[in-house]
């Protein structure tokens, strides 16, 4: 994908600085109330299907919205997108903002669905 080479490089650099979590682990932490799952996809993607119990904050506004919706910088936050790129960037950004326990869900919503985990509309 030469047309996305710069984006892919940016994501690869971000992934060096963050921790990823598998969808099954994210599901367990969401179910137990241990983590807040944040869907950073665009609204139309969210409307097409999302993780039950997740919070929507698009990649374009997460830095503006996060402090109001998740004020505790020690809260566990699991970001996810469609495939793992945008969530890696969002995770890195939240870490820079002082959030200490942020993870990016490996493989994004595609991996969540592939693991046959529940979805909602």
Feature locations, PLM:
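Rhodanese-like catalytic fold shared by cysteine-dependent sulfurtransferases
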Residues: 1-36, 43-77, 85-121
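Short cysteine clusters
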Residues: 81
């Amino acid at each position: 994908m030469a047309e996305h080479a710069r984006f892919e490089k940016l994501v690869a650099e971000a992934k060096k600085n963050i921790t990823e979590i598998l969808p099954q682990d994210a599901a367990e932490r969401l179910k137990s109330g241990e983590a807040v799952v944040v869907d950073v996809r665009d609204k139309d993607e969210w409307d097409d299907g999302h993780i039950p119990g997740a919070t929507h904050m698009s990649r374009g506004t997460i830095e503006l919205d996060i402090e109001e919706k998740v004020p505790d910088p020690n809260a566990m936050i699991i970001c996810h997108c469609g495939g793992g790129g945008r969530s890696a960037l969002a995770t890195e950004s939240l870490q820079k903002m002082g959030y200490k326990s942020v993870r990016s869900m490996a493989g994004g919503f595609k991996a969540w669905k592939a693991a046959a985990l529940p979805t909602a509309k």
